[in-house]
Amino acid sequence: MTDSAKDLAVRSQVTAEEWEVRINLAACYRLIAMYGWDDLIFTHDAARVPGPDDHFLINAYGLMFEEMTASTLVKVDLDGQIVLDSPYPINPAGFTIHSAVHAARPDAGCVLH
């Protein structure tokens, strides 16, 4: 499947609001890489998915920041369950930090560290 086909596949499964968050978070990852602020694959950023569920997007483990796209971001719940099929795993350490912040601060739309 080509990258554009993957984008269409994911885009067709999410709301317009979630797609916008995915685009913005992927851009954030790429900016971090461009400025050299990443730590290879061991840094994490996450964004809350708009809506009533406690879901957020986090980077796919194993991809470099400059490889991140809206479609490669992984959607998880606060228990670490992947809620939208993804071929990518997540980093448990990154999940632990971000889920704790998102659980404690429902007003936080994005967490960067």
How does the language model describe each region?
Residues T2-A16, C28:
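Generic N-terminal amphipathic, Lys/Arg-enriched alpha-helix
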Residues R22-L112:
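An anion-binding catalytic pocket shared by soluble metabolic enzymes
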